[in-house]
């Protein structure tokens, strides 16, 4: 079964790129056409690249790896936090701190400080201090939780990084590449594909598009975790098809191009079975019927 369908991608607006004047020429091979001054991304390629990224993430997690989810733009913050939390992976959805990967030793010390402050608050460690001291400690804890709360349980640098909008998260991409950490990312028409190891051509500005593709990556993580535990894949982890708005004619045309390819395989399998059925019925027919069928020819 496909990880995600063409209709789901169309419904979420994954095929919409940027205006034709705002593009990266390196993305030309991923562009299907342009409509009203806006590039349309080739979703056939998107489906292919989704499968590649899905398999990579699943295998990475199955072998004990972790995937860091990164998306600090408003359109992606909620889905990044929700999906990463669902599958127990670290995430950054506020501000990317410089050195979060390349200087992880220092970042890890700040994580220990965050846990220390939280423990103090829960065990009554703030008691006996002045109001000003309590206020300063509370502010420090709040700030650390806002910026580092998503990676509080990350004990080492991740095995891979999932990025929504490589242009906005250029620091995260640069640090990952410096450490040779594979980058999986949504590539809009204004992005540089050379910076990404596992690209997924698509719209990184629409909330539904970013949420759908993030859910696909999270589903791959979930399947990898289950494979690591020796459990069967959970079908509910796959994204569900949502009811969308009516498709335009050119969108229906794009969708129809994918239909013959999807129907070809089942049709090819069904043909031999259809031919075999009459032969099986002929062999199973009673012997008494054969003379009755031949009787007219003998009299003639």
Curated annotation (Swiss-Prot):
Disordered: annotated span: 228-300
Annotated InterPro entries: Ribosomal_uS2, Ribosomal_uS2_bac/mit/plastid, Ribosomal_uS2_CS, Ribosomal_uS2_flav_dom_sf
Keywords: Ribonucleoprotein, Ribosomal protein
UniProt xrefs under Pfam families: Ribosomal_S2
One Gene Ontology molecular-function label: structural constituent of ribosome
Family recorded in the similarity comment: Belongs to the universal ribosomal protein uS2 family.
Protein's name in the database: Small ribosomal subunit protein uS2
Lineage summary: Bacteria, Bacillati, Actinomycetota, Actinomycetes, Mycobacteriales
């Amino acid at each position: 079964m496909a990880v995600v369908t063409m209709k789901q991608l169309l419904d979420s607006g994954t095929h919409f790129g940027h205006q034709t004047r705002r593009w990266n020429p390196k993305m030309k091979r991923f562009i299907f056409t342009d409509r009203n001054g806006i590039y349309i991304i080739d979703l056939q390629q998107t489906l292919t690249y989704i499968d590649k990224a899905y398999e990579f993430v699943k295998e990475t997690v199955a072998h004990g790896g972790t995937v860091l989810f990164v998306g600090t733009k408003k359109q992606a913050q909620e889905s990044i936090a929700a999906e990463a939390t669902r599958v127990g992976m670290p995430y950054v959805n506020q501000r990317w701190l410089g050195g979060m990967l390349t200087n992880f030793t220092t970042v890890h010390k700040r994580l220990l400080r965050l846990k220390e402050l939280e423990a103090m608050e829960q065990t009554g460690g703030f008691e006996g201090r002045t109001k000003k001291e309590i206020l300063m400690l509370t502010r420090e804890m709040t700030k650390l939780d806002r910026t580092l709360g998503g990676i509080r349980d990350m004990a080492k640098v991740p095995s891979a990084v999932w990025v929504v909008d490589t242009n906005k998260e250029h620091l995260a991409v640069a640090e990952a590449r410096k450490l040779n950490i594979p980058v999986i990312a949504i590539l809009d028409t204004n992005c540089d594909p050379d910076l990404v190891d596992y690209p997924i051509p698509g719209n990184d500005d629409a909330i539904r598009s970013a949420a759908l593709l993030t859910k696909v990556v999270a589903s791959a993580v979930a399947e990898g975790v289950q494979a690591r535990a020796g459990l069967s894949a959970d079908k509910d982890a796959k994204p569900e098809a949502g009811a969308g708005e009516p498709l335009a004619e050119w969108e229906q045309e794009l969708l129809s191009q994918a239909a013959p390819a999807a129907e070809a395989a089942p049709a090819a399998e069904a043909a031999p079975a259809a031919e075999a059925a009459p032969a099986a019925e002929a062999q199973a027919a009673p012997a008494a019927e054969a003379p009755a069928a031949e009787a007219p020819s003998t009299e003639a």
